[in-house]
């Protein structure tokens, strides 16, 4: 056992099984070295959490890692196919960022992780100033819930990391924030990129 702490974020395929994501998170919570928690308190989604990374001395937060449940599919076809990060999650992010800044007496830099990309990813892909593969259109929600704007306003998120589109593994920038894809994993997933 390598004793490496880990965290998970949920995406659209996690709701396709007969097991609710709340049960999946409860199972994961019992695993050694899991650090995923659940924001609770009316924040929509499962596994939204902020993970502080302490500095070398252990007396202050050096970075915050924000994990968001990007949900799955919308129930209203007039709003597109994919669901979106909800207002309660955006409000939670702002509150947690402000709380961390007050506690640490500075704006703590952060990274954000979620499965389904926000609409700004497609804008970055079309700018052609990316590094990596841009082999498919970004499949993001039709509705823009303002998460990226909140990142810009808070001025703490330095990069976002998503999955979802298996033929993309690019990195681009918008408003000083890196928008990054992780490369697909697993042997049963679609796509042309090498595993």
Positions of predicted regions on the chain:
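A cross-family glycoside hydrolase active-site/sugar-binding cleft signature
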Residues: 9, 113-115, 182
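Binuclear metal-dependent phosphoesterase catalytic core
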Residues: 50-55, 59, 147-149, 154, ...
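Residues that line or immediately flank small-molecule/substrate-binding pockets and catalytic motifs
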Residues: 13, 164, 183
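Short, solvent-exposed loop/turn and secondary-structure capping segments
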Residues: 18-21, 77-80, 122-126, 173, ...
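His/acidic metal-ligating clusters that form di-metal
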Residues: 2, 64-67, 79-169
């Amino acid at each position: 056992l390598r004793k490496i702490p880990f965290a998970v974020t949920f995406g659209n395929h996690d709701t396709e099984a007969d097991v609710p994501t709340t049960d999946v998170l409860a199972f994961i919570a019992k695993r050694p070295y899991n650090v995923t928690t659940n924001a609770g308190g009316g924040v929509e989604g499962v596994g939204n959490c902020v993970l502080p990374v302490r500095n070398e001395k252990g007396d202050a937060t050096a970075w915050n890692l924000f994990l968001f449940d990007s949900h799955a599919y919308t129930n209203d076809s007039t709003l597109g196919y994919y669901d979106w990060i909800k207002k309660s999650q955006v409000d939670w992010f702002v509150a947690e960022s402000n709380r961390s800044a007050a506690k640490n007496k500075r704006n703590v830099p952060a990274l954000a992780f979620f499965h389904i990309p926000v609409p700004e990813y497609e804008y970055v892909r079309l700018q052609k100033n990316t590094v990596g593969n841009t082999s498919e259109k970004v499949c993001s929600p039709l509705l823009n819930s303002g998460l990226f704007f909140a990142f810009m306003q808070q001025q703490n998120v330095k990069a976002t990391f998503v999955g979802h589109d298996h033929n993309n593994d690019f990195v681009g920038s918008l408003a000083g924030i890196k928008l990054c894809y992780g490369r697909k994993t697993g042997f049963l997933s679609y796509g042309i990129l090498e595993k």
